Structures are given as C-alpha cells and as structure tokens.
Design a protein with these regions (language model features):
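Bacterial N-terminal signal peptides that target proteins for export
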Residues: 1-9
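A structural motif
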Residues: 167-185
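Conserved RecA-like P-loop NTPase ATPase core
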Residues: 11-13, 113
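Peri-catalytic and regulatory segments of divalent metal-dependent proteins
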Residues: 24-170, 187-193, 200-240
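Residue-level detector of alpha-helical hydrophobic segments embedded in or interacting with membranes
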Residues: 14-15, 26
Length: 241
C-alpha cells in the first residue's frame, strides 16, 4: 500500500507477536478446510479463523480499552463499511497500544490500528483512508484468495497455508520464510499476486472513501508523507516495506 513503486505498500501487516505467542497457534483447534484439491474457503470458515487469531491477539497484545477511542474507531470504521461493496461479514475495529506505525486486517472482518498510526494521521480522512484500504482487503477476501492461489501451486493443505499467511501478517520475515518453504519456488508469483491485491484494495478503498464523504486525496497524501519520512530509516515501518 505504501511505496508507490510497490503499489502503495502493504497495510495488511499485523502487530509483532513473540515466538511463544506464535507457537500458541499450534494449540488452536482450527477447522479442517481441505487440501489443495479441496473447495473454496467459506465465509463461515473465515469467521472461525478470525476468531481464533483474535484470541491470540487478545492474550498477547496491549489492546486499547479506552471507551472513547474505541467508540470513535468503531463509528468511523462502520461509516466506511456502510459505503463499501461486497460486505459479507460483520466488522470489528480495535486499536493496539504500539507506537510503531502499522495497521492490519484478517479473517472475519477484524481490522486493527496501532496507536502510533492513529497519532500520525493529520486528519480524519487520512485515518479513514487506512481503514478503507483494510476493509477492502476483507471484502475482497484477499487472504482466502491468496491461500487458494497458493494451494493450487503446491501440495500443501489450505490449513497449512493459513498458518503461513497469518504468520506473514504477524511477523513478515518469518512469514515469508514459511511461505517460501510451503510454496517451493512460487514466491515470485505470490509477490505478484500480493501486489495485485494491494492495487485492488487501493481502488476499492478510494471508492469507499468517496462514497462515505471523505477526501479521496487523503490516501496518497498520507501514504506518501510516511514514505518520505521513513525513506532513509534503517528500520522503516513494516507497512512501508
């Protein structure tokens, strides 16, 4: 979503989880959703995965419990959802207390913002632009589509791919390594597929912004400002990579 050379670099990255937390995914009773030859991941299965991952986040991340902030984020998010296309799941918006600039969405309509990103936005439209992009990732089912695309390219089960994709959201470097092992040589096609998703999320996100009455120029302005600010940083925000 952010770097313009990479289709406005990804905002679909998540809060950094510690290795012990990631290990907890092994104990989750995730549904058996078939092999590469199986059917499409259903909405109900996405909801199960989303709830499971949210349990991990609740137990490991400092979620903001301020009722005023939570109400504001929820109201803003649902204003955008009301103007979005292809809404198939309920949405839940929340904030993680983390000064790092980050935002992410995952199965089941969960959308999170880091407090650092919230504080960095200079207008409501800029904040809304981030939420609109993440909402588009959910409505267009980018995680499920990415999993299914990879399942067609390898003998791994979709369930194994789910773990890799969720790991990629939580810890990009580890997730990329997992995806590399899982897809065995199909990484370039995965990168291209991700870029395609980002372009689609930009397009749907800007459309949602316009329909909801926000400034559509806020998205390129905010993302561009962040890219310029962290251009020479040794450790830029994950969402700018």
């Amino acid at each position: 979503m952010f770097k313009r050379a990479r289709s406005i670099a990804c905002l679909c990255i998540a809060a950094t989880l510690s290795p012990p937390t990631l290990a907890n995914t092994n104990s989750l009773e995730l549904p058996d959703i078939g092999t590469a030859a199986g059917g499409t991941l259903t909405i109900d299965q996405e909801l199960i995965y989303g709830d499971a991952y949210m349990r991990i986040i609740r137990s490991s991340q400092p979620i903001v419990n301020d009722p005023v902030l939570n109400q504001y984020i929820d109201t803003l998010g649902h204003r955008l959802v009301a103007s979005a296309n292809d809404v198939k799941t309920p949405f839940q918006f929340f904030m993680i207390r983390d000064r790092n600039i980050n935002a992410f969405a995952f199965f089941g309509g969960y959308v999170a913002l880091h407090s650092g990103l919230f504080l960095h936005a200079q207008s409501e439209s800029e904040l809304a632009s981030v939420l609109a992009h993440e909402i588009a990732h959910v409505t267009q089912r980018h995680l499920a589509r990415s999993m299914e695309d990879q399942a067609r390219r390898s003998p791994a089960t979709i369930a194994a791919l789910a773990a890799s994709v969720l790991l990629a959201i939580a810890a990009p470097e580890a997730g990329i390594a997992a995806l590399t092992a899982t897809t065995a040589g199909n990484m370039q096609s995965q990168i291209n597929y991700t870029r395609s998703n980002e372009k689609e999320a930009d397009r749907f996100g800007i459309n949602t912004l316009a329909k909801a009455g926000f400034d559509v120029n806020a998205m390129p302005r905010f993302f561009g400002r962040l890219a310029d600010e962290y251009r020479y940083a040794s450790t830029p925000p994950p969402m700018l990579l």
